[in-house]
UniProtKB/Swiss-Prot annotation:
Name the record gives this protein: Large ribosomal subunit protein uL6
Subunit organization: Part of the 50S ribosomal subunit.
Gene name, Swiss-Prot/TrEMBL: rplF
Gene Ontology terms describing biological process: cytoplasmic translation
Keywords recorded for this protein, A-Z: Ribonucleoprotein, Ribosomal protein, RNA-binding, rRNA-binding
Amino acid sequence: MSRIGRKPVEIPAGVEIKQDGNVVTVKGPKGELTRTMSSDITMSVDGNVVSFDRPNDNNKMRALHGTTRANFNNMVEGVVNGFEKKLELIGVGYRAQLKGKTLILNLGYSNPVEMETPEDLKVEVPDNTHINISGISKQRVGDLAAEIRAVRSPEPYKGKGVRYVGEYVRRKEGKTGK
């Protein structure tokens, strides 16, 4: 069996689960998330514990089993605690600012890069070199953080660019003169 898929998910107090066919809705103190699960994986609720079962043991089902359980666990975790990603801008003149729901990034290009922030995510710029993204959906938070990082990902020679806080950028040595 899948090692992650067979672990049951504990449902904390204050979290409601509603299943309508393949559509699962998780409602908690921070909000509500809805996701369509695979029809091959069966979900069973027993008190405050949810477990997932698969029909057979082929590789595709094993992978789907663990993924379904992990996605559901992230939904429960998100409506209770939420998720947060922190980015830092490293480089001379690299800075970020928030105007309304628009994130403006000055990253060494000729024009600033403007990005609209989604309604369901909270984007903060505590100082002009740090960006905090928080929300209840782990996937949405990670996608927006990756999108911002992709505008100018860290380069290996000077380490300039947008990186996650605590991310290690492997450095390379430059060319040596004759």
